[in-house]
Amino acid sequence: APWLFFDAYIDCNVDEICFHIEAYSKTVTPHEQIMTTSRTVDTVDYQRLEKDIYYLKTHDIKPGITLNPNTPPDVLNPILNQIDSVLVMSVHPGFSGQSFIESSVEKVQTIRQSFHGDIKVDGGVNNTNAKKLTDAGANVLISASYLFGSNDYKTAIDLLR
């Protein structure tokens, strides 16, 4: 329930809040499934989601929507004109040591066809996939393990560009 935390972030004067669309699923994901993979969504409570997007905008916060790897990008279609960014998770959140999910490149490309805001990618981003992602339309790359695992941050960052 991301909406439970919005006011705390607003009090911190943040500029943007990205939150998972999976939190707005009308179907319940079985607990056993959550323990082995990230949540996905097929039926979204758009009424609640649009209410929360509007709430953030009334507080001058840019709303961004995060998609887990198994969530199809078309769930964004009803709200694309209401949000400022999309964050594509290219690994399953909460499970460390994963490899980059290659289908994320196609997901970015699909989103970019109809969305002109920021497209961010997080998870397994490194020097071998960064160019593919930016060519597909991503303009913000989040890369922690690759950078922090490097002995030379400057070179690692240069290789991402």
Describe these PLM feature segments.
Residues 1, 22-24, 66-70, 91, ...:
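Active-site beta-loop-alpha junctions enriched in small/polar residues
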Residues 1-12, 71-83, 125-141:
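Catalytic cores of alpha/beta
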Residues 1-56, 61-65:
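Glycine/small-residue-rich loop that forms an oxyanion/phosphate-binding "nest" at active or ligand-binding sites
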Residues 9, 86, 111, 122, ...:
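Conserved, mostly hydrophobic/aromatic
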Residues 15-18, 60-66, 85-87, 118-120, ...:
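Structural preference for beta-strand elements that scaffold enzyme active sites
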Residues 17-26, 87-96, 136-157:
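Glycine-rich phosphate-binding active-site loops on the catalytic face of alpha/beta enzymes
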Residues 34, 69-71, 75-109, 113, ...:
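Glycine/Thr-rich beta-alpha phosphate-binding loop at enzyme active sites
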Residues 41, 52-66, 102-123, 159-161:
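Alpha-helix-loop-beta-strand connector modules within alpha/beta enzyme cores
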